[in-house]
Amino acid sequence: NDIALIGEGVRQVYEEVLTPAGLGQVKIFTELGRFMLAPHGILVTKVTHKKKTYRTYLGVDASAVNLMRPAMYGAYHHITNMMNPDGQTEVVDVVGSLCENNDKFAVNRELPQTEIGDLLVIHDTGAHGFSMGYQYNAKLRSAEVLYAEDGSTRLIRRAERPEDYFATLYGFDFDKD
């Protein structure tokens, strides 16, 4: 995924096709969110439930509110168990905390054995985590922390608070006792 190589290929086609057709002034725009930003974000979530029925479910405290892509169209995001990254594996579904049947981060995924309280890292969430997030079922979007090349971190977006849930409503005074 060499962006310079891709750009050169686009430029060649532009000059071979658009310029001779009298369209050399046309501007081309692209959205590079996944390409540029996805690798630079992670979602950290805690395992809150483990249920074994006909399959094993890991319930986590995050949900599609925090990362919509897997629920919306089954997008794959690698998941690491930070408490047991190299342990024996088991096949699990990693499910969010919403009451919707598509609130899943992984289906039939082989992961190192996981226990309640373990922290999972869902990788490559930097592009469309917060921007695709939404307020639903009293779930609020999580904070965003920037992890710099030097290892330092800083808060770049605070977690939503309950008052944010109603911030755009008019005609109600939620501050009254």
What are these regions (language model features)?
Residues 1-28:
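Acidic, glycine-rich loop-and-beta core segments that form the ion-binding/anion-interacting portion
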Residues 23-177:
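Charged (often Lys/Glu-rich) extended helix/loop segments that serve as interaction or gating elements
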